Amino acid sequence: MTIFQGRATRKPSGGKLRPNHSKRRYELGREPTLTRLGDRELRKIRSYGGNSKFALLRCDYANVYNPKDKTTRKVKINTVKENSADPHYVQRNIMNRGTVISTELGDARITSRPGQDGVINAVLL
């Protein structure tokens, strides 16, 4: 079943809204890409205007920026420590923007959107 991101058909009062147009392709959404910890796996998605996005399904490395040294290194991710989006994501090792991960260098917060960017960028805490 598809995800429709257009206007609802009912008003807050319960009255019916008349549609201005039928459903259009640009109003379609998709299921969220829940990036998990594991061997790297990408999926290419066609986006608006014929462009493409890369959804990261699984990954075990992150580009971690160290603000003290002002250097970036590719390091291995150990586990997911904290996720403000959903506490159950920690148990399932799901990573998204704002997730705190444990790496070889220490704890880091993810700054990219892995489900849409195709990479995991993070900043050391």
Swiss-Prot record:
Ribosomal protein found in the keyword field: yes
CC per GO annotation: ribonucleoprotein complex; ribosome
Domain of life: Archaea
GO molecular function, one term: structural constituent of ribosome
GO biological process terms, semicolon-separated: translation
InterPro entries: Ribosomal_eS8, Ribosomal_eS8_CS, Ribosomal_protein_eS8_arc, Ribosomal_Se8/biogenesis_NSA2
Subunit-level organization: Part of the 30S ribosomal subunit.
Matching PANTHER family: 40S RIBOSOMAL PROTEIN S8
Sequence similarity: Belongs to the eukaryotic ribosomal protein eS8 family.
Protein's name according to its UniProt entry: Small ribosomal subunit protein eS8
